[in-house]
C-alpha cells in the first residue's frame, strides 16, 4: 500500500509538471540589440513544452542568460523572475527581467609574434584588427583573432605554428579584460619538387602546368591552382595534389605528390534538341580527351536538322611550354545548308594558334581554307578561299548556368587575296558583345550587340556563310531566322555586307526559378549604308532556370513594318553568353 501511494504521488507530480509546461510562456525583458540576439540564441535550445515556473527551470534560464551576456562582456547582470497570471484566454508568463550591469572593457591586448610572423605583412596587418582599449569585451573578437592567426599559418605555410600562451584574463573588480597571446609561427615552408603518379601524359607536360617554382614560398592558393590546372586539361578523371609533410619537417621544403587517374579514352554523347531557328536537331559527339602521351585530343561531331547538316572535327595539340593556355587547333568539316534562298555545300579546313591569357582574354591567329559550292538567290558559284585571320575574345560570368553577372566579347578580322590563290579579295571585320547585369537579385538585364563589315569588289563570290543575315532568336526577334538582308530582282535574299543589330532585354524573377521577360531588338543587314533599312521587333517571354541551363519561350512581332505583321515564337535552350 505505501508503494502504491508513492507511485500515485510521483504520477501527480509528473501530471502537475506537464500541466505547468503546457500553460507557461517564457518572456525576457530589459535587453535589446546584440545583447538580446545573443541571449535569444542561448535560450533557443529550450522548447516551449519545457517551460515551467519551478526553481530548476529558472536556474537553467538564469545560466543561459548569463552565458549569453558574458560572451559580450557583461559579467554581472541582475536577473529577477516573476510569474504573472495569465491574460484572458492566455497562458501564465514566466517573466525574466534582466539588467546587464556594468560591462567589462578591454584593458590591454598583448600579442607577441615570434618566428616568421614578426616580419610577415599579413600577420602585422592582423595586429591592426585588435579592439581598441576601452571597448566592451567581446569573446568572439578574441576567438576570431586566434582563428585568424591559425588561418594565416595554413594559408601561407607556417605549418609548425603554435600558441606558447593564449589567455583572456578578466579582472571583475576593475571591470577590465586583458589579452595575453604569445604566438610562434615558426619558419615558413617552401614548395619542393612535384611528382606525379598514375599519369598517361609525359611528365614534362605536367611539370609545365605547375604555377610555381621549386623554392617559392608556400601559398595554399597556388596548390589549389595546380589542382585546377590539371583538371582543366581534360586528361584526367580525378586529380589530387597533396603535400608530403613527413619529408619536410627538417628542411621546411615541402614536396608535393599528385595522384591522377586517366580519363576514359573514348566518350560518346548524343542529344536531341529543338530551337525555332532550325527546328528539331539531332547531335552526336565522339570525344577522345587524350590520344597519346603528348596530350593531343580529338572531338568529332555530327549534327542534323532540316536546314543544316554538319560533320566536323577538332584536333587539339597542346604546346610543351604551356600546355593549358597555348595550343594548336586543327579543325575541318563538311556542311550542307538549305535555308530560305540559300543552298550551299561547304568543305573547310583551318589551322589556329591559341593563347589563353591570365587576364581572361583569348587570342588566336588562324589560316583557313574552304571550298564552297552555293546558290544564293539567282546566283550560283563555286569559290575556293585561303585566308588568314586574327581573333580576340573573353567570356566572364558569375552565378552558374544562368549568370547574374557576365559579359562575352569577340572581335575578329579575316583577309583574303587572290595573290595567294583565293578566288576573291575581301576583308571581314566582326564584333559581338553580350552583357548581363542583375540588380537586387530579381531584376536582370541582358544586352546584345553585333557589328559586321565586308569589304570586297566581287560580293557574288563571297560564300553565304561569310555574308550577313539578320533575324531570329539571337538577332532580331519578330522575324524568321536569317530572313533579313537585301534582295535581288526576283525578291530572293542576297545576304549583306554590313550588319548592325542590338537587343535590350529586361527579366524579372517572378518566383523561384521562373523569370518573365520583355525585350526589344533592332538592327539591319544592308549592302549600302546610304539605304538604311532598320527592322525592330519586340515581345515578351518566359525563362526557366533548368539544371542544364536556361530554357526560354519568347513571343515577338515586328514593329512598324508594313510588310511583316505576323507573330513569331522562339523556343531555345542554352547559355546566354
From Swiss-Prot:
The chain crosses the membrane at residues 265-276, 279-288, 297-306, 309-317, 327-336, 347-356, 361-370, 387-395, 406-415, 428-437, 444-453, 500-508, 514-523, 536-545, 549-557, 568-577. It is found in: Cell outer membrane. Residues 187-263 form the POTRA domain. One of its GO terms (biological process) is protein secretion. The keyword Cell cycle does not apply. InterPro entries: Bac_surfAg_D15 (IPR000184), BamA/TamA_POTRA (IPR010827), D15-like (IPR039910), POTRA (IPR034746), TamA_POTRA_Dom_1 (IPR035243). Disruption phenotype: 8-fold reduction in ability to colonize mice in competitive assays with wild-type. The mutant does not express the major autotransporter p1121 on the cell surface. Its main location: membrane. One of its GO terms (cellular component) is TAM protein secretion complex. Interacts with TamB to form the translocation and assembly module (TAM). This is Translocation and assembly module subunit TamA.
Amino acid at each position: 500500500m505505501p508503494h502504491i501511494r508513492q507511485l500515485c504521488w510521483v504520477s501527480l507530480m509528473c501530471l502537475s509538471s506537464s500541466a505547468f509546461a503546457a500553460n507557461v510562456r517564457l518572456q525576457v525583458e530589459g535587453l535589446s540589440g546584440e545583447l538580446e540576439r545573443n541571449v535569444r540564441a542561448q535560450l533557443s535550445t529550450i522548447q516551449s513544452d519545457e517551460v515551467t515556473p519551478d526553481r530548476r527551470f529558472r536556474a537553467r534560464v538564469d545560466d543561459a542568460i548569463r552565458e549569453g551576456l558574458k560572451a559580450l562582456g557583461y559579467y554581472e547582470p541582475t536577473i529577477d523572475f516573476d510569474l504573472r497570471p495569465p491574460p484572458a484566454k492566455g497562458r501564465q508568463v514566466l517573466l525574466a527581467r534582466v539588467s546587464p550591469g556594468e560591462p567589462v572593457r578591454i584593458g590591454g591586448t598583448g600579442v607577441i609574434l615570434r618566428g616568421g610572423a614578426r616580419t610577415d605583412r599579413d600577420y602585422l596587418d592582423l595586429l591592426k584588427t585588435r579592439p581598441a582599449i576601452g571597448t566592451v569585451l567581446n569573446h568572439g573578437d578574441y576567438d576570431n583573432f586566434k582563428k585568424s592567426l591559425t588561418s594565416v599559418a595554413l594559408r601561407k605555410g607556417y605549418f609548425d605554428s603554435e600558441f606558447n600562451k593564449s589567455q583572456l584574463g578578466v579582472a571583475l573588480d576593475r571591470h577590465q579584460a586583458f589579452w595575453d597571446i604569445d604566438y610562434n609561427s615558426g619558419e615558413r615552408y617552401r614548395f619542393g619538387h612535384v611528382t606525379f603518379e598514375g599519369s598517361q601524359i609525359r611528365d614534362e607536360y605536367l611539370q609545365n602546368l605547375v604555377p610555381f617554382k621549386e623554392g617559392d614560398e608556400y601559398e595554399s592558393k597556388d596548390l589549389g591552382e595546380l589542382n585546377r590546372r590539371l583538371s582543366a586539361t581534360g586528361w584526367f578523371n580525378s586529380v589530387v595534389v597533396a603535400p608530403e609533410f613527413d619529408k619536410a619537417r627538417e628542411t621546411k621544403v615541402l614536396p608535393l605528390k599528385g595522384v591522377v587517374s586517366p580519363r576514359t579514352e573514348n566518350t560518346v554523347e548524343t542529344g536531341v534538341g529543338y530551337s525555332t531557328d532550325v527546328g528539331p536537331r539531332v547531335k552526336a559527339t565522339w570525344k577522345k580527351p587524350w590520344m597519346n602521351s603528348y596530350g593531343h585530343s580529338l572531338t568529332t561531331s555530327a549534327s542534323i536538322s532540316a536546314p543544316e547538316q554538319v560533320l566536323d572535327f577538332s584536333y587539339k595539340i597542346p604546346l610543351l611550354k604551356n600546355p593549358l593556355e597555348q595550343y594548336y587547333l586543327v579543325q575541318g568539316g563538311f556542311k550542307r545548308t538549305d535555308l530560305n534562298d540559300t543552298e550551299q555545300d561547304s568543305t573547310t579546313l583551318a589551322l589556329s594558334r591559341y593563347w589563353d591569357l591570365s587576364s581572361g582574354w583569348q587570342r588566336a591567329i588562324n589560316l583557313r581554307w574552304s571550298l564552297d559550292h552555293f546558290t544564293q538567290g539567282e546566283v550560283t558559284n563555286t569559290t575556293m578561299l585561303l585566308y588568314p585571320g586574327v581573333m580576340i575574345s573573353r567570356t566572364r560570368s558569375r552565378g552558374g548556368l544562368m549568370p547574374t553577372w557576365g559579359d562575352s566579347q569577340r572581335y575578329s578580322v579575316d583577309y583574303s587575296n587572290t595573290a595567294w590563290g583565293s578566288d576573291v579579295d575581301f576583308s571581314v571585320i566582326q564584333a559581338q558583345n553580350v552583357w548581363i547585369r542583375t540588380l537586387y537579385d530579381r531584376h536582370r538585364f541582358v544586352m546584345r550587340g553585333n557589328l559586321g563589315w565586308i569589304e570586297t569588289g566581287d560580293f557574288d563570290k563571297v560564300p553565304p556563310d561569310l555574308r550577313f543575315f539578320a533575324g531570329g532568336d539571337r538577332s532580331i526577334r519578330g522575324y524568321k531566322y536569317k530572313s533579313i538582308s537585301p534582295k535581288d530582282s526576283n525578291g530572293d535574299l542576297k545576304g549583306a555586307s554590313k550588319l548592325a543589330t542590338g537587343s535590350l532585354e529586361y527579366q524579372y524573377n517572378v518566383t523561384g526559378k521562373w523569370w518573365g521577360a520583355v525585350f526589344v531588338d533592332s538592327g539591319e543587314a544592308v549592302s549600302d549604308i546610304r539605304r538604311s533599312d532598320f527592322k525592330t521587333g519586340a515581345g515578351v517571354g518566359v525563362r526557366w532556370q533548368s539544371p542544364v541551363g536556361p530554357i526560354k519561350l519568347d513571343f515577338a512581332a515586328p514593329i512598324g513594318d508594313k510588310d511583316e505583321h505576323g507573330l513569331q515564337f522562339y523556343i531555345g535552350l542554352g547559355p546566354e553568353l
